[in-house]
Each structure stands twice: as structure tokens, then as C-alpha cells.
A protein has these predicted regions:
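A short, Lys/Arg-enriched amphipathic alpha-helix followed by its capping loop at the start of a domain
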Residues: 2-6, 182
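Acidic (Asp/Glu)-rich catalytic clusters
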Residues: 4-5, 38-45, 71-75
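Short beta-strand segments at enzyme active-site cores
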Residues: 7-15, 49-50, 80-83
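Glycine-rich, proline-tolerant flexible connector loops at the mouths of alpha/beta enzymes
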Residues: 10-30
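Internal, glycine-rich beta/alpha segment that forms the wall or movable "lid"
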Residues: 23, 59-181
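Alpha-helix-loop-beta-strand connector modules within alpha/beta enzyme cores
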Residues: 25-49
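Aromatic/His-enriched, Gly/Pro-containing loop or helix-boundary segments
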Residues: 31, 47-60, 99-102
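Conserved small/polar residues in nucleotide/adenosyl-binding loops
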Residues: 185-189
Length: 189
């Protein structure tokens, strides 16, 4: 409440998928950001709620569902910071070899497109909620994604209705040429 009175605009939670006890404690000890932001959503009404989630070590369906859920819980205040995860040590936590820089950004472009596509599987008016007529969802307004790309195969649709914002905000802070291209082609609308 104090933050909202102080015109605070966004709570942004970074994330790190690797614990290095030699690093600064803020990089080592972290709550999972979407869970924390969901709790914070119940005590705020205006502040945006942004979380970092990796496109290299996550899957698009789960990310789309989680941010759509946060958007519903918060009344349309969710934001996703899409990162490719530069720390090679993270790969060991997922039983895989860390992809090189170029490959991570190729994956990220497809990942972001799939997430946005899943958010768009539900038309704005798909949830009818007609008690008298006995119709809750208009199936003609819910569409499969049927994405089959180089890195991801996702059928869809998402199993949560359209987010209050339509699509939660997507952020990306990579400053390399690949990061700028990701923002230009896949993130900016």
C-alpha cells in the first residue's frame, strides 16, 4: 500500500537458476518470482508485477500459463522479462549442455512467439458465462496453436482463458545484436 501511494510503478523480480555460495546472497537465495508476485498481487491494486523467466530452461506452455494466471490474479498487471540465461552453470541443473549465445537467441525467438500464440488461442469473448443458456465457453472462439518449429512443438490451446491485458507485457533487456533483434522481431508490437 505504501509503494502504491508513493507512485511506485513496477515490482520487478529477477531470477537466477543457479546457486553459487560465493556470489552475492541476492544472487544465491531467491524465492521463485511468479509465486512471490502472485502473493504480492493480493495486497496491491495498481503496481505492475514483472518476473524474469528463462527461455532456455523453461517450456513455452508453462510460461504462457503462469503469466496468464498472474495476469488474472492481478487484474491485468503481469509482465514477463524473457531472458536467455547466460550462466553456463545453469545447464547442469537441467541435465543439459548450455547452448551457445546464438542458439539461445534462436530458441528465444521461437519461444516468445509460441507464448504469444498461446495467449492468443482464446478470443476476448470466448468465455460466455451464460447461466440461463447453460453455456460457459464458446468452443468456436478457442483455437489450437498447432506450432511445430525447430525447437518447440506445442498443440495448444492454453488451458486458461484470455488474460485481462490480452497478452501480458513482454520485456527483454539483452543489449547484444541478437538481443536487439529478439526485441525488434519477436517482442515489440
Amino acid at each position: 500500500a505504501s509503494a502504491e501511494r508513493g507512485l511506485f510503478d513496477l515490482i520487478f523480480m529477477g531470477d537466477n537458476l543457479n546457486a553459487d555460495p560465493r556470489a552475492h546472497p541476492s544472487y544465491t537465495l531467491r524465492l521463485e518470482p511468479l509465486t512471490l508476485l502472485s502473493a504480492l498481487a493480493t495486497g496491491t491494486h495498481r503496481i505492475g508485477l514483472g518476473a524474469t523467466v528463462s527461455t532456455t530452461y523453461s517450456d513455452p506452455f508453462t510460461v504462457a500459463r503462469a503469466f496468464a494466471s498472474l495476469d488474472h490474479i492481478s487484474g491485468g498487471r503481469a509482465a514477463w522479462n524473457a531472458v536467455t540465461t547466460s550462466n553456463a552453470a545453469v545447464g547442469a541443473n537441467f541435465g543439459t549442455v548450455h547452448p551457445d549465445h546464438a542458439r539461445r537467441y534462436e530458441m528465444a525467438g521461437e519461444f516468445v512467439d509460441v507464448v504469444k500464440g498461446l495467449w492468443d488461442c482464446w478470443d476476448d469473448d470466448a468465455v460466455v458465462a451464460d447461466k440461463v443458456g447453460g453455456v460457459y465457453i464458446d468452443p468456436s472462439k478457442v483455437h489450437a496453436l498447432r506450432h511445430a518449429g525447430e525447437f518447440f512443438k506445442v498443440e495448444g490451446p492454453l488451458n486458461i482463458g484470455r488474460a485481462p491485458q490480452g497478452r501480458p507485457v513482454v520485456l527483454q533487456a539483452g543489449g547484444s545484436n541478437a538481443g536487439l533483434q529478439l526485441s525488434l522481431i519477436h517482442i515489440s508490437e
